Curated annotation (Swiss-Prot):
Belongs to the binding-protein-dependent transport system permease family. OppBC subfamily. It is a multi-pass membrane protein. It comes from Haemophilus influenzae (strain ATCC 51907 / DSM 11121 / KW20 / Rd). The gene is dppB. This is Dipeptide transport system permease protein DppB. InterPro entries: BPD_transp_1_N, MetI-like, MetI-like_sf. GO terms for biological process: protein transport.
């Protein structure tokens, strides 16, 4: 087991290095001058421009900028935002609860719905129910996030009276010590704040969780069909066990093992999908922060946010690999 864990951890190192190189290169190849965007055209002389470039370290060769950046990252310094002059880590962890809250509920409903729909589609194989679920999951997987979000805002939100953007309506003023709006609105005791926070979360969570729902549904259906054809399932039927008990207790438990392996990919999907989702719904999280940084050519924010998110995804995938190694010892050899 130790050898298996060591190999998995060792594989993370080249991945991390590749991410830093690719991120640094892509960020610096974005068209536009960050100094011009920061200062505007008014009062930006050649002397001021050169001074700002030197102050930000942008006048150095790219390889020197890269090694300087990596040296700071190793020390836990991700730099400061060009726009706000605040440390990137401080801004990231200030905004992260909003994204984490949205991603958690998107993952929760997509897991719950995907497992239920996938199981039903497998049990009702070759029926209209199975075909409908399969077609719906394919549609959900192919649907553009921005289009789906706009449809919900234009047609579903007015019908159900759901907020079209933001985490809480402006009529509510509460303290946010944790950054998690559901927790803070509950603790505040302000009448109607918690209900409004829940309503504000519904549409963004639906949009963000649609693609993961489709993935989990198809994965669960495929795994369940394979498990339901195993000999021990036929033995359980021969013993007279109820079909419901066979499906839930014996089949589903084993069918969920492959589903665990895609959780890491789903986390990556949620974090990447949050960029568009948060922009559509004016959700003040990491995704919207990244979009604003792209428009402002804020290199430290772009490099730091991508690196931190990539690290989170790597850690999640590593954890999933290790857990899968515990559940299924065969992959350790």
């Amino acid at each position: 087991m130790f050898k298996f864990v060591f190999k998995r951890i060792l594989m993370v190192i080249p991945t991390f290095i590749a991410i830093t190189l690719i991120t640094f290169a892509l960020v610096h190849f974005i068209p536009g001058d960050p100094v011009e965007i920061m200062m505007g055209e008014r009062g930006l002389t050649a002397e001021v421009h050169q001074q700002m470039m030197h102050q930000l370290g942008l006048d150095l060769p790219l390889y020197q900028q890269y090694f300087h950046y990596i040296g700071n990252v190793i020390q836990g310094d991700f730099g400061a935002s060009f726009r706000t002059q605040q440390p990137v880590l401080t801004e990231f962890f200030t905004l992260f609860p909003a994204t984490a809250e949205l991603a958690f509920f998107a993952l929760f409903w997509s897991l719950l719905g995907g497992i239920i729909l996938g199981t039903i589609a497998a049990v009702k194989k070759d029926s209209w129910i199975s075909h409908t679920v399969t077609a719906a999951s394919l549609t959900g997987y192919s649907m553009p996030i921005f289009w789906w979000g706009l449809i919900l805002i234009l047609y579903v939100s007015p019908q159900l009276g759901l907020p079209q953007g933001g985490r809480l309506d402006n009529e509510f003023w509460i303290d946010t010590p944790t950054g998690f709006m559901l927790i803070d609105s509950w603790l505040s005791g302000v009448s109607g704040a918690f209900e409004n926070a829940v309503k504000s979360l519904i549409l963004p969570a639906i949009v963000l969780g649609t693609v993961p729902l489709a993935i989990i549904t198809r994965m669960t259906r495929s795994a369940m069909l394979e498990v339901l054809g195993e000999d021990y399932i036929r033995t359980a039927k021969a013993k007279g066990l109820s079909y419901t008990r066979i499906v839930i207790v014996h089949a589903l438990r084993n069918a969920l093992i492959p589903v665990v392996t895609v959780v890491g990919l789903i986390v990556a999907q949620l974090l990447s999908g949050a960029v568009l989702t948060e922009t559509i719904f004016s959700w003040p999280g990491i995704g919207k922060w990244i979009i604003d940084a792209i428009q402002a050519r804020d290199y430290p924010v772009l490099q730091g946010s991508v690196l931190i998110i990539a690290t989170i995804i790597i850690v999640v995938n590593l954890t999933v690999d290790l857990l899968y190694g515990v559940v299924n010892p065969r992959i350790r050899h």
